[in-house]
């Protein structure tokens, strides 16, 4: 099953800020992850987050694109069969987690 993909408006802006060649690599990665966005413990690609850097990111997943230094945080919407992308960034883990927490609160995710 391929899961649907939704971007928060801010995540779309994150994508647009990336260099075009990086965007292509990230989109390929997102397509691959959408085939199985579940946690690694369930055979998927996502690494579950919890309480990171003084932020509660429980029920969120992360993917690192190591070759290009990009991190992506997303939430699995099981009922809708959608992975909702919250942040895509080249920032450090701490910065990405803080931004994900902020967006989660703003959008009540």
Locations of regions flagged by a protein language model:
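Arg/Lys-rich, positively charged N-terminal/basic patches that mediate binding to nucleic acids
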Residues: 1-32
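Non-catalytic, surface-exposed connector residues within folded enzymatic/regulatory domains
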Residues: 5, 42-43, 97
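Enriched for short, Lys/Arg-rich terminal
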Residues: 13, 58, 65-109
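Solvent-exposed amphipathic alpha-helical surface segments
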Residues: 18, 33-37, 107
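A short, surface-exposed loop/turn module that caps and links secondary-structure elements
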Residues: 34-64
């Amino acid at each position: 099953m391929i899961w649907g993909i939704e971007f928060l408006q801010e995540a779309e802006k994150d994508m647009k800020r990336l260099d075009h060649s990086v965007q292509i690599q990230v989109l390929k990665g997102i397509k691959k992850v959408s085939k199985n966005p579940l946690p690694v413990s369930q055979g998927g690609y996502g690494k579950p987050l919890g309480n990171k850097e003084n932020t509660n990111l429980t029920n969120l997943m992360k993917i690192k694109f190591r070759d290009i230094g990009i991190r992506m945080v997303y939430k699995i919407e099981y009922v809708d069969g959608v992975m909702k992308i919250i942040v895509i960034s080249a920032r450090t883990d701490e910065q990405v987690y803080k931004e994900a927490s902020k967006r989660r609160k703003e959008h009540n995710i």
